[in-house]
């Protein structure tokens, strides 16, 4: 029959280790004291036999005896403290490893902590953290699934209502254009809710890869973005630089990020204006979208990236575009900035990403 080895607590390890160290050095000190005392007694006896019992000689022998005890005692205490420090450092090493593991994690890394220790407290803390992370992951997954299911269930009836309105307009010559426009806004809002729910699923499965911003993100999105801008006679200008910029991330999410930036510029820019995409790699990767709109109130830039916050309610939307951009940027461990252009009126929205 095999018995499972019982894990020792951190307190027990410290007490046992320090106790053994003190016991060993106490035995050494006792032996040293006995050895020196025996030697001094023999010297005194020899001095008495030789009639060298004058005060000067006695004080000299006393000083030698005290020195022979103090100097080794100081050395032994110092050595004891040093060894105790090394022992405590070795025993608490799992705590330091746990600290490094937690500090190195990003906010989106919800994988279980893989630290194995024979110390009871460390095992309990790691187990509790892993259980908390598991519950948090389950809650977030359920929230994403609920949002995606609700948005998906809304798209089907909205599409049916739009189809019926188009048939009503053709058969009964009824002006339903305002209703169709409102339905289109609702369907766009539902699509954004779906995007917000799905953002991060690729990263949660570790789907990291090298992505070229021009070749894998901007050019594949050009036709879709250009079609969107043509509805308001706007022009999309691509980067002039021939050099591509490579980052590490998810191409699908970065295309979603770019689409939301361009869509936001398209919504708030006048008709017939230009929307420009820039990329650079000095020193980190930058992807920027500039428009020729009225600009923004820079004191409110922090709130504009929050969910359901809009720049201007006159332009429609539900305020999820920049929130999606901010979320995708965080997943790529980057930074999102929003500011007014300096050379002319307009807004510059750009993300700072780490190069591969």
UniProtKB/Swiss-Prot annotation:
Keywords: ATP-binding, Cell inner membrane, Cell membrane, Kinase, Membrane, Nucleotide-binding, Phosphoprotein, Transferase, Transmembrane, Transmembrane helix, Two-component regulatory system, Virulence. The keyword Ribosomal protein does not apply. It is a multi-pass membrane protein. It comes from the Bacteria. One of its GO terms (molecular function) is ATP binding. GO terms for biological process: phosphorelay signal transduction system. One of its GO terms (cellular component) is plasma membrane. Induction: The eptA-basRS operon is positively autoregulated by BasR under high iron or aluminum concentration conditions. Disulfide bonds: none annotated. Coiled coil: none annotated. Signal peptide: none annotated. The keyword Secreted does not apply. Its EC number is 2.7.13.3. It catalyses: ATP + protein L-histidine = ADP + protein N-phospho-L-histidine. Autophosphorylated. SMART domains: HAMP, HATPase_c, HisKA. Residues 149-356 form the Histidine kinase domain. It is an enzyme of class 2 (transferase). Member of the two-component regulatory system BasS/BasR. Autophosphorylates and activates BasR by phosphorylation. Plays a role in the adaptation of the organism to the host environment, in particular to neutrophils, and therefore it plays a role in virulence as well. This is Sensor protein BasS. It comes from Salmonella typhimurium (strain LT2 / SGSC1412 / ATCC 700720).
């Amino acid at each position: 029959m095999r018995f499972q080895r019982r894990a020792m607590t951190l307190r027990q390890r410290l007490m046992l280790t320090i106790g053994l160290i003190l016991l060993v050095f106490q035995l050494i000190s006792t032996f040293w004291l006995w050895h020196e005392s025996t030697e001094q007694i023999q010297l005194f006896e020899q001095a008495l036999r030789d009639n060298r019992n004058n005060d000067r000689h006695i004080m000299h022998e006393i000083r030698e005896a005290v020195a022979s005890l103090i100097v080794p005692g100081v050395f032994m205490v110092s050595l004891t403290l040093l060894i105790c420090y090394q022992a405590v450092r070795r025993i608490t090493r799992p705590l330091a490893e746990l600290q490094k593991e937690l500090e190195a994690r990003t906010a989106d890394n919800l994988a279980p902590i893989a630290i194995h220790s024979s110390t009871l407290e460390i095992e309990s803390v790691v187990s509790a953290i892993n259980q908390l992370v598991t519950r948090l992951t389950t809650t977030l997954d359920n929230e994403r699934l609920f949002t995606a299911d609700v948005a998906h269930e809304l798209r089907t009836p909205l599409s049916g209502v739009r189809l019926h309105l188009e048939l009503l307009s053709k058969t009964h010559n009824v002006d339903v254009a305002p209703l169709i426009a409102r339905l289109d806004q609702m369907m766009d809002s539902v699509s954004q809710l779906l995007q917000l729910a799905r953002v991060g699923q690729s990263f949660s499965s570790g789907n990291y890869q090298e992505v070229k911003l021009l070749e894998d993100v901007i050019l594949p999105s050009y036709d879709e973005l250009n079609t969107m801008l043509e509805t308001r006679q706007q022009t999309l200008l691509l980067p002039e630089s021939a050099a591509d910029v490579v980052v590490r991330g998810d191409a699908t999410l970065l295309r979603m990020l770019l689409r939301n930036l361009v869509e936001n510029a398209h919504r708030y820019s006048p008709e017939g204006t230009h929307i420009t995409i820039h990329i650079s790699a000095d020193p980190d990767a930058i992807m920027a979208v500039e428009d020729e709109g009225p600009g923004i109130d820079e004191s409110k830039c922090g709130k504009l990236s929050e969910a359901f916050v809009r720049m201007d309610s006159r332009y429609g939307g539900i305020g999820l575009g920049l929130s999606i951009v901010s979320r995708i940027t965080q997943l790529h461990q980057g930074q999102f900035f929003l500011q007014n252009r300096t050379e002319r009126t307009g807004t510059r929205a750009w993300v700072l990403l780490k190069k591969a």
